[in-house]
Amino acid sequence: MQVEDWGPAWADPCALTRPAKPHPEPVFLNPFDNLIWHRPRVQRLFDFTHVFEAYKPAARRTHGYYVCPLLADGRLIGRADFARHNGALTIQQASLEPHAGPDAAATLARSCQSLAAVIGHDRIELAEGAADPTVTAALRSVCLQTERTVHP
């Protein structure tokens, strides 16, 4: 198999004959997910720079200790760093990629809501300064609709 601007590549012939099934809902990926563990490939395929910042001093982190990229419609459109405290999902940092599109803030907010539900939390809290005004407004909108609370 040849791909323009790539070195040698291999693909399972069966995988090339079946149409890919997109994941129906946006999903946060953990930093060790097979899709993103090889950073140069992620940069090449998604134009997404992912750095695992857990070993950096807190003052040098850009996105957070254990940041999770957000996969939506086959693109990495944002990222968030989460913590769990006293029955709440705390968003310590949330941001969108420049190419994310006009609905990305709402998608990120709904994805935070889904994650909170999956892990059994009934509250979402937003750390002070964790997100820009667009993302913060989207989180407030989603949380109000679902009776979850966002605390600045």
Predicted regions and their residues:
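Long, charged, low-complexity, helical-prone intrinsically disordered regions
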Residues: 1-152
